[in-house]
């Protein structure tokens, strides 16, 4: 998408040449290569990418290639106004760290984890901590066979009334502390 003329530009690419830019469109942060048909390729770390962007209501990942990402820790932490997050286009096949990924996303009332490939994830510490708006969290599609850290994974999730842990493989977990 081409950035509107009146928008305030934020240069977000690695070399600072303006090849990838971001701007706010109301409550939506948009990121673009400014080249039609070309995706933004994320670095290996998306740590804190949207952290404490409290005005964000939605994020469209259809133009972001995350296939090389290994660290998504704190990625959405503190995005308090988001009520739902569409993870359909988020490629997580190489991610090893999802700690604090949704921490303090207090507005989330719906979170479909089905699109996430968590087969390589080892750290899920505080992944859903303080997601007070979630009443139901379906973990049946999460592959946790390689996870070693699950400390405080659901800490402070005071709204959770339905949480089925029967499919959670904790055989390699060494830290489940609170």
Name these PLM-found stretches.
Residues 1-178:
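Negatively charged
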